[in-house]
Structures are given as C-alpha cells and as structure tokens.
Amino acid sequence: GLKDWWNKHKDKIVEVVKEMGKAGLNAA
C-alpha cells in the first residue's frame, strides 16, 4: 500500500525535497 511505498522511499523523497527547498530559496 501507500504506507509501504512511503516507508521505502521517504529518505530519498526527503533529500529531494530539501534540495528543491534550497534551490527555491536561492532563486528567490
């Protein structure tokens, strides 16, 4: 289910979100 998918990928997702956040702050 979705929870299993999230648990499998959350570390990578968090890293990507952090990078996107940094890029957004730098662009602003």
Curated annotation (Swiss-Prot):
Positions carrying Methionine sulfoxide: 20
Coiled-coil residue spans: none
Q: Where is the signal peptide?
A: none
Entry protein name: M-poneritoxin-Dq4b/U1-poneritoxin-Dq4c/U1-poneritoxin-Dq4d
What this protein is reported to do is described as: M-poneritoxin-Dq4b: this synthetic peptide has antimicrobial activity against Gram-positive bacteria B.amyloliquefacies S499 (MIC=0.1 mM), L.monocytogenes 2231 and S.aureus ATCC 29213, against Gram-negative bacteria P.putida BTP1, P.aeruginosa PaO1 and E.coli ATCC 10536, and against the fungi S.cerevisiae, R.mucilaginosa and C.cucumerinum. Not active against the fungi F.oxysporum and B.cinerea.
Tissue expression as described in the entry? Expressed by the venom gland.
Residues modified as Alanine amide: 28
Its lineage opens with: Eukaryota, Metazoa, Ecdysozoa, Arthropoda, Hexapoda
Query: Which keywords label this protein?
Result: Amidation, Antibiotic, Antimicrobial, Fungicide, Oxidation, Secreted
Spell out the subcellular localization from the entry: Secreted
| One cellular-component annotation, GO | extracellular region
Q: Per the UniProt entry, what is one GO biological process?
A: defense response to bacterium
Q: Which domain of life is it from?
A: Eukaryota
Q: Does the keyword Thylakoid apply?
A: no
